[in-house]
Amino acid sequence: MAYRGGGPNDYEGHDLQDLPPGSGNGSRDEGVDDVGQSLLRDPHARGTSPYEHHLGAQEPPARPVSAYSLTESYAPDAGSRTPAPPPDNFGVGTGYSQELDPQNGGFGYGRPASTVDTDESWVRRQQPGAQTGGLKRYATRKIKLQQGSVLSIDYPVPSAIKNAVQPKYRDVEGGSEEFMKMRYTAATCDPNDFTLKNGYDLRPRMYNRHTEVLIAITYYNEDKNLLSRTLHGVMQNIRDIVNLKKSTFWNKGGPAWQKIVVCLVFDGIEKADKNVLDVLATVGIYQDGVVKKDVDGKETIAHIFEYTSQLSVTPNQQLIRPVDDGPSTLPPVQFIFCLKGKNSKKINSHRWLFNAFGRILNPEICILLDAGTKPSPRSLLALWEGFYNDKDLGGACGEIHAMLGKGGKKLLNPLVAVQNFEYKISNILDKPLESSFGYVSVLPGAFSAYRFRAIMGRPLEQYFHGDHTLSKILGKKGIDGMNIFKKNMFLAEDRILCFELVAKAGQKWHLSYIKAAKGETDVPEGAAEFISQRRRWLNGSFAASLYSLMHFGRMYKSGHNLIRMFFFHIQLIYNVLNVIFTWFSLASYYLTTSIIMNLVGTPTEASADSSAHTAWPFGDSATPIINSILQYLYLAFLVIQFVLALGNRPKGSKFTYIASFIVFGFIQTYILVLSGYLVARAFNTPIGDQISLESGKAFVDSFFGGDNAAGVILVALVTIYGLNFIASFMYLDPWHMFHSFPYYLVLMSTYINILMVYAFNNWHDVSWGTKGSDKAEALPSAHISKGEKGEEAVVEEIDKPQEDIDSQFEQTVRRALEPFKEVEEVEKRDVEDSYKSFRTGLVVSWLFSNAALIVFITTDDFNAFGFSDDPNGRSAAFFSFLLYSTAVLALVRFTGFLWFLGKTGIMCCIARR
């Protein structure tokens, strides 16, 4: 199809032509239903263009084809080679490879050294006239500033981009420039001052459109594959919403796509991958040579680009554009791209989202995504439906699962399998339980949604106390005035927002988990990266959990009814018990290990109540010795973890940490084997002889009391293992129990012995693993000039001709579609010495309280205190208490899961569509 244009200044002279079958190779990206390839051709170049053969045209077109039209092939079964380029008029080849290598995303352009993208080359491209080597002089135009200080300029987009828009969306007669111009605004203010009163505005509001859903993608330094995965997934989800046929909401009051805005917030220019900017430029929401470092000496805090595009780039660098009106065609998407001048962390990015853009657009729902998280089909619709069907729902999250690779090949990595199981069980047991109570302790920032009016006010005010750019304004309430405990709390800032939302005075907002919404994210695959990530998670969640427990009294000022408050109190008790068990988990794991070794490895003589047992598995002589060696090895590696955590970075001790995972995994495997032997030995005696059914009292006494082990073991097997299997099968998602659960059983002790030890020993480190940057890029400035007679302030801006815009775009697309080669960077972290004293006190109190519990359970000398003089008796009592407590907590989780599953099934039947 080719759009023939309207007026002479609109789209004339720039066609979009489809390739005939067999002209290229279209490798299909997994999970992507729209496959296309972008090829650029230049018929005006000397000799035969390297792209001429891709067109496959047998005769010249009726009129000249644009030098920079986007031409796509939808022939996935076509051959993988194209004809080799003939020499040019000088008898020399073009220098570009013509092979479409499937491993290269279907684009095999050889790239001259001059186009290799680096930070330096990106900075050079921002200078005026950089694309022409500075030799060409452009005409200029005068741009009036809004209210005398706000610089907002409309720039023509490349012809190929505006030609990609379907004709039915182009309002040429109405004079709309939505698809013809990209809008750039240099925000020289704080996000709180980005208001209509101060002269700032956004396109959707200027077009008088109601924004129902604002989708935010926060970015730090991810590569273009990760961003493309998120961005393309979002556009596919928007297509799902637009294609709804029977919706009573989306199909009234204007097209559905006009009610959705996608906002990308980049945390600083310096750390951003410049290849990602090329991808955004290919879509149409960014251009080189536009950004201004300052406006008349006032520093630009954020560069804001706005455009509505129908183009998308897949993770394997394939350009997708509309070809027909079929259901697979992507609709127009309204984009806001906020490129912050400096790195100021994720909370500040959310302040731009909520306080700047949110207040102008006033959306009903805000959906938060991290770059790299791919929403599954119809997931964003499922999140929105949750709010649409529940007027009191203030926040929600979906299921996040680990990216396992093609055919699940990443599951061969034990760390990936362990994290996959952790995510799955959290989604099956933990989130449904908390959702049943009405308070989900954490809505992951990588995939969650909030009702905008629910978080306005105190929730966002408390949340933004963690923004270091507000530290001078907030004073003692800001991040610089906080103690180390509060600073750690803001490492898990999403937990703070969740608590403040539920506890909002006079309101009855609750939080929910939505099963139908699913998102896929990549997880750390190396030990060092895994440990560093969990340091922030564990410390932040521990501090935030204590914060919510200490401030539970604020719930009484909310508007929740008595039934909801009753369940909040049950959840409070459950959370207190979880915090206590987490605190003493270091001792619990060691005691469990030593008790099981002693039970199996100590020979016993026959008595009236039990038969004789030899030490297992190595005999009476060798087994106690081997068990003692393993216990000492356990303690030795535990001490090593403290030494490593206090003085080394995970990346600097990578092999030692890998050895620690192996040692603890080996000991845990040995314990699992011994546990299996204990179970078999306990059931050597028929269970009917061990448990009495004569009366209720006799059953309770024989099952839970006495010397019989069958009751304790049955409870442990059913609650620790059985409920996981039952819940997973009822959830219709049991596969992780087969391919990931065994890995988790082997490595579960490392969550405490390695991850928590490292986290608590680095309590003083309140960094995100990223540091703020004060480096200002060498970008051009905008200088204000005024006329002699008090004329309005204006800025002179280059008026670049369309041919030069298109020429620049050709190079941009080449860079964008090049495969990304990952460069490993050395992480640098500054340790704050002033926090080490607090860190030391925390670690010592934690270590000594756990050591005291071990001594109390195992020592022989407690006669003076009135305790039993038999340490084996105390060990058995502790072990029974531990198992029963774990069983009770597991039953509570399972009950919440059952309630959630039933409620979800009923709501599916009665919910409004």
Curated annotation (Swiss-Prot):
One of its GO terms (molecular function) is chitin synthase activity. Residues 41-56 have a biased composition (Basic and acidic residues). Keywords: Cell membrane, Cell wall biogenesis/degradation, Glycoprotein, Glycosyltransferase, Membrane, Transferase, Transmembrane, Transmembrane helix, Virulence. Its main location: membrane. One of its GO terms (biological process) is chitin biosynthetic process. The keyword Glycosyltransferase applies. Its EC number is 2.4.1.16. The keyword Cell wall biogenesis/degradation applies. Pfam families: Chitin_synth_1, Chitin_synth_1N. It is an enzyme of class 2 (transferase). Glycans are attached at residues 25, 539. It catalyses: [(1->4)-N-acetyl-beta-D-glucosaminyl](n) + UDP-N-acetyl-alpha-D-glucosamine = [(1->4)-N-acetyl-beta-D-glucosaminyl](n+1) + UDP + H(+). It is a multi-pass membrane protein. One of its GO terms (cellular component) is plasma membrane. The chain crosses the membrane at residues 566-586, 625-645, 658-678, 712-732, 740-760, 840-860, 881-901. Disruption phenotype: Leads to a winkled surface morphology. Significantly impairs conidiation. Impairs penetration in host plants and exhibits a significant reduced pathogenicity in Arabidopsis and cotton plants. Residues 1-135 are annotated as: Disordered. It is found in: Cell membrane. Polymerizes chitin, a structural polymer of the cell wall and septum, by transferring the sugar moiety of UDP-GlcNAc to the non-reducing end of the growing chitin polymer. Plays a role in cell wall integrity and is involved in tolerance to hyperosmotic conditions. Required to successfully penetrate the host plants and thus plays a key role in pathogenicity. Belongs to the chitin synthase family. Class III subfamily. This is Chitin synthase 1. It comes from Verticillium dahliae (strain VdLs.17 / ATCC MYA-4575 / FGSC 10137). The gene is CHS1.
